[in-house]
């Protein structure tokens, strides 16, 4: 029986991935024009991880007028991201509110497991005061040492509730996130909100488009049939 549900945030709880693609596409064109798919390469990674991988080599900033250092340029990107997130639309994925309410009615513990940081969550809480009532715990990038696709975040989510990973379902939309859930040993429920069904199917135990018409009973049946 499913005892805990561990949700990614963007593309799983909120329909925000397309907005992030706009932001990171813009950043990619400015700093990495040689990577036309930059906004997709960074999906599921923390901000620190993005900076460490793509924004430490000073050659990246050679064309930036008034460049003073990688850390200073990273700070400028962070400031732009913070401002962008303040103005984002945080709309729930269709059917989410009914689905998570059904989970909680059946005693399923629910947590957010996200690569986003605390500042991002403060924006969420301001926009959706009811958000905290849906979740028993919110784990952000500050809570784990390894980023997705490493399973650390999902293992910590299961440990927080004192349950085995195999008694959890992890809900993800990104390739890195799906890999993290699968590596943790939890049931992997993929959402085709960011990538196509065909693309995420190999990394998922089951795929849904959104939560409309999907219930705890459906989830439990699917998990049992997969055993």
Report residues per predicted region:
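Asp-based, Mg2+/Mn2+-dependent phosphohydrolase catalytic module
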Residues: 1-3, 101-104, 117-227
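N-terminal helical cap/lid subdomain that shapes the substrate entry/recognition surface
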Residues: 2-97, 101-106, 119
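Ser/Thr-glycine-rich phosphate-binding loops at phosphate-binding pockets of nucleotides
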Residues: 12, 16, 114, 177
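A generic structural signal for short
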Residues: 12-13, 87-88, 110, 142, ...
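Conserved SAM-binding loop
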Residues: 13, 92, 110-113, 146, ...
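Secondary-structure boundary/capping motif
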Residues: 15-16, 112, 120, 149
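Residue-level detector of anion-binding/catalytic polar loops
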Residues: 34, 109, 187
